[in-house]
Amino acid sequence: MSQNKLVSITIVTYNSGRFIKRCLESVLAQRYPSREIIVIDNNSQDGTVDILEQFEDRCTVVYNDENIGFAAAQNQAIGLSSGDWVLTLNPDVLLLPNFIQALVDAGQIHPKIGTVCGKLLAMTATFDIPARPLVDSTGIYFNPMLRHLDRGSQEIDNGHYLNFEYVFGATAAAALYRRQMIEDIAIVNEFFDPDFFVYREDADVAWRAQLMGWRCIYTPHARGYHVRNVLPGNRRALPPEINMHSVKNRFLMRIKNMTPDLYRRNWFSITVRDVVVLGACLLHEHSSLRAFVYLAKNWKRVIAKRREIMRRRRAKDDYIASWFSYRPVSRPAPKPTARTLAKARAARG
């Protein structure tokens, strides 16, 4: 339906040898013809490089000498890209053939749609699809404790989430971002915040985008599968480094994006969660105490980013506060039609 605007698919690999071949094959099988693929490898040591070399004639592949983190590597890929849209993709994602087309169609509905997400279903680490499909994500939402969660996560997929909806944000495992939004909300020319390194960087982008007046739409027509490694219930099984970044990024996200009004409305819930997090670090997860050392050392830079975000903020307090709920919040969105897509094409000349 949509005129074929160039879509840049950006993938970051780090010891992703189990997944990357099938991920790239699913991207190359997309029916959407106007695309470029950029892969940044963060110094993988597991054979990922050997696999990527097989795709160098169909992708741009950059091999970093060190692991600079997901956020910085995605920024690196975005800097090399030239598409009107950027699809960030995890290597453990498998896309159905119309995924990109459906995302682009949904993005044409309104010029202030800066992010588009589809319906991701859960998949095993061997890329097996369960007999009873489970939802992985249909967008992300925040609760009053400032926890960000995937909408529908681990629910049995019985045919729900069938409507186009505005949601708070998208998981960067498979999120389509409008170039105009990327440039508009970037801080110090960085879309993802490299201070995050890994984890929660997509929630930070979602919050910043909402503050700056952009919207995220969910389309049920874009379907894919994702191997989910980080879930609320499996924290103890994760590497200490990931858990440390999780703690650090919870506070980074808040320092940068939380308005005084939002804190006033939710201070009790936020404090309860902070006590739980700090108590867990002191009693059980000592390695995560490094998160607070990082915040102290980099305080001036983080505060400078906050000042810039608040200076450029466009959204009103009531609107932002309306998204923070213990139940996922969504709002009805129109479907893409031939007429809306034709208008979008005409506007582009």
Residue ranges and their predicted role:
Residues 94-136, 140-147:
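Conserved donor NDP-sugar-binding/catalytic core segment of glycosyltransferases
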Residues 24-66:
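Acidic donor-binding segment of Leloir-type glycosyltransferases
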Residues 64-81, 91, 102:
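Glycine-rich, basic loop-to-helix element that forms the pyrophosphate-binding segment
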Residues 215-307, 312, 317-322, 326:
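Active-site-adjacent helix/loop segment of glycosyltransferases
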Residues 86:
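Short aromatic/hydrophobic "clamp" motif used to bind/position activated sugar donors
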Residues 140, 144-149, 155-179, 198, ...:
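A recurrent flexible, glycine/aromatic-enriched loop bordering the glycosyltransferase active site
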Residues 168-186, 190-223:
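A short, conserved alpha-helix in the catalytic core of glycosyltransferases
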Residues 1-29:
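N-proximal low-complexity "stem/linker" segments adjacent to membrane-targeting elements
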